[in-house]
């Protein structure tokens, strides 16, 4: 890369585009608030209301007499952008002279992957018992085997339906590799023909659920073993907001090299806990 040819806006957009392809946990979140983020510490107010009461009336009893209008409860929550993922790397002039001129572009892609990894880890760990997230629906801690994997996943999805999540609402499960292997062995009718399931960790469909695989599933040792905290959720369960990636090119004073530094601001929060079930499990 020639320093003079560096276009920060283009590189920032390239990073954001790469992030979109790399996200697994962030991919299935509500991201409608991202355009409002300008700086670290920004707060997004996510407006919501409760359900109004609907009363049944029999016309045999005469005309309807309305009571005082109900004040429907406010369910608004705040999402704070309190995280930043950043990078700072350089390529020496000698390396470029030896034919590594495109290495900065490659490093840009690698940096994007690592930023996506940091963001995904943050969202995955919103359900870690140490996260402080309140209102989580925790399924019973379960040892998963070939014999019970399908019944366990079905039971988790049934909890969502019990919370009035519509069967027509898209749901996704994000499994660690070992659990996906058990699922794959137990379920032979996976829909993997569609090329859509080659992106964002998607590996299969099961009913109306999209099955994803990720190494970033939250883990906590319970004193005996590592327990994985699998998310089964709708696209409204977690809100995620981020800024546009920011990049700058510069020449470090201490070396003969071109360097690029950049960051992305973000925040995430469980905003609809009834649309998220957490499965603590182990092999």
What does each model-found stretch correspond to?
Residues 132-202:
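Extended, solvent-exposed, turn-rich assembly/linker loops in the middle of proteins
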Residues 59-68:
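Short Gly/aromatic-enriched secondary-structure transition segments
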Residues 91-163, 278-283:
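Alpha-helical scaffold segments that mediate packing/assembly in large oligomeric complexes
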Residues 2-30, 35-55, 75-80, 98, ...:
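Sequence/fold signature of self-assembling virion shell proteins
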Residues 93, 175-177, 264:
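Short, structured patches in soluble enzyme cores that scaffold and shape functional sites
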Residues 23, 27, 115, 119, ...:
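Residue-level signal for secondary-structure boundary elements
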Residues 10-11, 15, 19-20, 119, ...:
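Generic structural signal of hydrophobic/aromatic residues within well-ordered alpha-helices
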Residues 68-106:
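Long, hydrophobic/aromatic-enriched structural stretches that serve as scaffold segments
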């Amino acid at each position: 890369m020639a320093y003079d040819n560096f276009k920060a806006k283009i590189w920032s957009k390239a990073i954001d585009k790469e992030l979109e392809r790399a996200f697994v946990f962030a991919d299935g979140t509500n991201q409608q608030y991202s355009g409002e983020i300008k700086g670290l510490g920004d707060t997004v107010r996510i407006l919501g209301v409760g359900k109004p009461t609907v009363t049944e009336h029999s016309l045999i009893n005469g005309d309807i007499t309305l009571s005082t209008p109900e004040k429907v409860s406010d369910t608004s929550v705040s999402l704070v952008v309190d995280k930043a993922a950043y990078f700072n790397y350089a390529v020496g002039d000698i390396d470029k002279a030896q034919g590594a001129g495109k290495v900065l572009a490659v490093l840009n892609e690698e940096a994007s992957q690592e930023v996506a990894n940091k963001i995904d880890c943050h969202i995955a760990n919103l359900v870690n018992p140490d996260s402080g997230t309140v209102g989580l629906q925790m399924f019973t801690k379960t040892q998963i085997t070939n014999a019970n994997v399908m019944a366990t996943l079905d039971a988790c999805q049934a909890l969502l339906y019990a919370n009035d999540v519509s069967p027509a609402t898209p749901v996704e499960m994000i499994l660690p590799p070992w659990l996906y292997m058990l699922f794959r062995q137990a379920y032979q009718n996976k829909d993997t023909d569609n090329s859509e399931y080659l992106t964002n960790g998607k590996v299969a469909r099961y009913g109306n659920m999209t099955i994803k695989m990720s190494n970033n599933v939250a883990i906590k040792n319970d004193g005996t073993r590592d327990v994985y905290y699998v998310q089964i959720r709708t696209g409204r369960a977690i809100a995620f907001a981020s800024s546009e990636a920011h990049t700058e090119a510069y020449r470090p004073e201490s070396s003969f090299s071109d360097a690029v530094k950049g960051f992305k601001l973000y925040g995430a929060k469980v905003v609809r806990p009834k649309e998220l079930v957490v499965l603590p499990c182990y092999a």
